[in-house]
Amino acid sequence: EYPYTRSTRPNGHRSDFWTMTQVTGFGRGEEWSRRARYMLDQGLSGLILEYDLATTNGYDSDDPMVEGEVGRAGMALDSLEDLEAAFDLPFDKLKYLMSVCNAPQPVNLAMVIAALEKKGVDPQDFVLHIVNGILIEYTCVGRYIYPPEHGLRIATDCIEYIIRNHPNW
């Protein structure tokens, strides 16, 4: 009976296999998509999309400040078209998608939802987990785009949107 105490489902994790995931992210959307399809073909049921430092710091790939860093430690994301290319996936095999973007997360969240909808995929069909790590950047990484009070407001706005519009996430 709701509210469940061990999971979001009545039988907890006993009713389903664990979601197998692996972190990946490099290059552009097409390259990430090829790697993601390969991982799904190998039996993974979840994907963790990591973005490059240019993206997580709010830079476009053509900015001179990030020359040599684009696509190295994650996928470069400059536009909705990048995510559309990345999401050329067999979504029927995918149960879980994590998007790690931190400070630009509000924009990334909107782009992920828009790219899924353009692909004809209902975001409610699987679990989307976003890493909304504003404080991680401020306290652990030592770089940040927003001061903590503004970053927390933006992060809680994302949480409120998800609670209202995508409660199964």
Language-model-derived ranges and their functions:
Residues 1-169:
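Catalytic alpha/beta active-site cores
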